[in-house]
Amino acid sequence: MTLLQREENIIRKGNIDKEFSEKIKAAGGDSLEYCFQCGTCTGSCPSGRRTPYRVRQIIRKANVGLKDEIISDPTLWMCTTCYSCQERCPRKVKIVDVVKLARNEAAKAGFMAPAHKAVGSFVIKTGHGVPINDATMELRKAVGLGELPPTTHQFPEALEEVQKIIKATGFDQLIGYNWETGELE
């Protein structure tokens, strides 16, 4: 059996989600049709050098409408949104917009990397994706800054506002945050 004859390499009409393709195009991904699969995006990707993440495959699947294959793929979360792929794309495809939209769809469908959920939990608890620690406070003092930045760390009352927004948008439910335990479910 050749590579092309493998069952997993066959695109079936039933797997194509035209609504997903249209949603991507409506969100600025209409440039997707210009992609001719040159591979510049994948070759430019710093994450792709160290992981199985291949942005070119995601773009191809998005163009075809293979929503389920994209949103269930754990490598979707390996993109750092550095824009290296998009800046180098000879066809000016809005690659990062496509990745972000695909991640939103993945999250809605229950596919989200545990590390991303953990960052979301930190935002709920502290207002920051990366909470301040003792070492950072010492560094801030050493360069003449206050120990705490002028954010929710310095103004804890602002955290309540952040948490209201999180509840109003349903972000807490999206990541499975339990307000009683303060942990992810």
Swiss-Prot record:
Q: Where is the 4Fe-4S ferredoxin-type domain?
A: 25-55, 68-99
The protein's annotated pathway: Cofactor metabolism; coenzyme M-coenzyme B heterodisulfide reduction; coenzyme B and coenzyme M from coenzyme M-coenzyme B heterodisulfide: step 1/1
Cofactor binding comment, as recorded: Binds 2 [4Fe-4S] clusters per subunit.
Can you tell me which residues bind [4Fe-4S] cluster 1?
A: 35, 38, 41, 89
**Reported cofactor(s):** [4Fe-4S] cluster
Residues bound to [4Fe-4S] cluster 2: 45, 79, 82, 85
Determine if Zinc-finger is one of this entry's keywords.
Answer: no
Listed A to Z, the keywords are: 4Fe-4S, Iron, Iron-sulfur, Metal-binding, Methanogenesis, Oxidoreductase, Repeat
The EC number(s) given in the record are 1.8.98.5
> Which family does the similarity line name?
Belongs to the HdrC family.
Question: Oligomeric state and partners?
Answer: The heterodisulfide reductase is composed of three subunits; HdrA, HdrB and HdrC. It forms a complex with the F420-non-reducing hydrogenase (Mvh), which provides the reducing equivalents to the heterodisulfide reductase.
PANTHER family the UniProt entry points to: IRON-SULFUR-BINDING OXIDOREDUCTASE FADF-RELATED, IRON-SULFUR-BINDING OXIDOREDUCTASE FADF-RELATED-RELATED
Function field: Part of a complex that catalyzes the reversible reduction of CoM-S-S-CoB to the thiol-coenzymes H-S-CoM (coenzyme M) and H-S-CoB (coenzyme B).
Q: What is this protein called?
A: H(2):CoB-CoM heterodisulfide,ferredoxin reductase subunit C
Gene source species: Methanothermobacter marburgensis (strain ATCC BAA-927 / DSM 2133 / JCM 14651 / NBRC 100331 / OCM 82 / Marburg)
The organism that produces this protein has a lineage beginning with: Archaea, Methanobacteriati, Methanobacteriota, Methanomada group, Methanobacteria
